[in-house]
C-alpha cells in the first residue's frame, strides 16, 4: 500500500499482454482500465498487437482532480496526515479509498495530454453514461476528438451510470465489441 504506484498497475497490464495474449488483441477497459488501455495502445511496443479498443467511461487523468476533491472534504487532522505523506482511508461510494499524496503525484507522469492528438489509430468504441457521477461524459467527447484514428465512435447513453452495467448498456457493450472485432 505504501509503495504501489499507478505505473505498477499499467506495467501489470503490460505484463499480461506480453505473457498471455498472442496475436491481435482488443482491449476492453472500464474506468481506470480505459486509461490503462489507452496508455498501452499508445506504446510503440504494442502497435502490432493491440488492434482495437472498447472503453467504458474511461477515467483519463483521474487521480489528481479526484484526490484534491476528496482532500478538501477531510478534517484538518486527515489533511495533515496526507501532507506528511501518509495514507488516509476514506469511505466513499466505491467502499474505501486510500489516499496517498505520492501516488497522485507519481500518476501525473502518466496523464494523457488531450490538447494534442493522441496517436492511437485502432478501431475504438467509447461508451459513456450521462448519469456518470464519477467521470463526466464530456471527457469522452474530448477523448474522441483527440484520437487520431478515424474508426472511432462514441456512444452516450442518457440513463447509464459509471458502471454501464444495466441490461441495455451491456447489450451496447457487447455490440461495440463485436463491431471492433469485425473492423479489425
Predicted regions and their residues:
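Primarily recognizes the serine-hydrolase "nucleophile elbow" in alpha/beta-hydrolase
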Residues: 16-74
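The alpha/beta-hydrolase serine catalytic core
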Residues: 48-125, 129-146, 150-156, 161-184
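Catalytic nucleophile-loop/oxyanion-hole region of alpha/beta-hydrolase
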Residues: 1-21
